[in-house]
Amino acid sequence: MEVNVKGNYVQVYVMLPLDAVSVNNRFEKGDELRAQLRKLVEAGVDGVMVDVWWGLVEGKGPKAYDWSAYKQLFELVQKAGLKLQAIMSFHQCGGNVGDAVNIPIPQWVRDVGTRDPDIFYTDGHGTRNIEYLTLGVDNQPLFHGRSAVQMYADYMTSFRENMKDFLDAGVIVDIEVGLGPAGEMRYPSYPQSHGWSFPGIGEFICYDKYLQADFKAAAAAVGHPEWEFPNDVGQYNDTPERTQFFRDNGTYLSEKGRFFLAWYSNNLIKHGDRILDEANKVFLGYKVQLAIKISGIHWWYKVPSHAAELTAGYYNLHDRDGYRTIARMLKRHRASINFTCAEMRDLEQSSQAMSAPEELVQQVLSAGWREGLNVACENALPRYDPTAYNTILRNARPHGINQSGPPEHKLFGFTYLRLSNQLVEGQNYVNFKTFVDRMHANLPRDPYVDPMAPLPRSGPEISIEMILQAAQPKLQPFPFQEHTDLPVGPTGGMGGQAEGPTCGMGGQVKGPTGGMGGQAEDPTSGIGGELPATM
């Protein structure tokens, strides 16, 4: 029976602290981390995930890479017998309330921005977001003769060359490629440092000169050189009904509105496609999984316009699947989706935000599975209670345990955010160990589960028109069971109600939480976990 049940095993990883390598690019917490890793091994965890910060490694100058601290960290992980998921973190860490760590993108890159501030994402008020370079400069050779895509490719190449021993040994099994703020493939549409607060719809962030020029050229190409960006979209903290664009039957449905939304979201897909193609070339032949992170924009999901998703770059409507198009692009690169919100329940959300995290998770996971992708998830808030763990378990195997082999649909892996003493002590640790056992289908930890084949070359380039064929018709998601069939202990009354956006911005669990909800210690949807940073 065990041989058949083994196909239900879902790997569990734990995200390391944001400052596992210090802001001075030194490995200073070896003793503390070593003790915590022992606890993870005891719990049966398969591996860990870590941000590999661009701002630290290439901080001293163009191509002046310093990997020494990360090598020490990776050696510690290897000695613990754990696998490693490495995030190519091309974004800034820090800049918001609650962020204990501040790691900007390299100073020499920011210096280019003093001469040309349009290298940064820009909102309609002219405010620059310095957490991540605008996709408008992907192919612009503005950075000491290199384009943004070339800088990212060179960084990944140097990583491969310097971490070859860990790649060859099978320690590094996953390369998650940062594609935007908080490491997510999205626009910085809801920056707290610009005054955004939950559940604001956010704003379209495409006002740098490079994206403006691209839009004008695209509009002229379809015979409408007079078209401008929409001016009826409201501001960061509006609700959909307060805007002409997002309200029911609003101008987002007009010819001009549809053209703009397609242009905005298509550029994001092309951005991901370009950088993943480079990542594929860099890691070609190595036994690694390429992955990207998609943000869980769950607020306003229940309104027709899906306003907050649209401003983030996810063109998702009741009759248009904005996530399957992304999955179709990823299929070319055999890359996986890493999604968040896996622990969230609709009933924990504020009714005014029209949130539906459970339906969103169901849609995104189904989109990935329909395209034949490996699909992974994370939690949004640090939670330690059976209620949250059981929601994750339900999403990990939405049809339950299959006694005769691998289930038709299951997560490829789950990453818990994040490692702390609170996780590995007392009842929290007891619950976590039980959760890991349940994710493993009550089987012993297996370091050889889901072996990776050498990464093949990406498939032939496909046109955006072919990618968009995945958007319609929008199919119903696969059915999910209401509850897991392999639960962690009692579930009653242990959740609490989420007051803020808990996928991408933190938020606080409202009401009695019994030590299980609390405030997000840091990023809740970002690859590294930090809140979206803007200045």
Curated annotation (Swiss-Prot):
Enzyme class: hydrolase
Reactions that this protein is recorded to catalyse: Hydrolysis of (1->4)-alpha-D-glucosidic linkages in polysaccharides so as to remove successive maltose units from the non-reducing ends of the chains
EC number: 3.2.1.2
Sequence repeat locations: 489-499, 500-510, 511-521, 522-532
Domain of life of the native organism: Eukaryota
Matching PROSITE patterns: BETA_AMYLASE_1, BETA_AMYLASE_2
Signal sequence segment: none
Keyword Hydrolase included in the entry's annotation: yes
A Pfam family annotated for this UniProt entry: Glyco_hydro_14
Residue sites binding substrate per the record: D51, H91, D99, K293, H298, T340, N379, A380, R418
Residue segments, region Disordered: 513-535
GO biological process, one term: polysaccharide catabolic process
Subunit structure: Monomer.
Family, as annotated: Belongs to the glycosyl hydrolase 14 family.
Protein name (database record): Beta-amylase
Record organism: Hordeum vulgare (Barley)
Taxonomy of the source species: Eukaryota, Viridiplantae, Streptophyta, Embryophyta, Tracheophyta
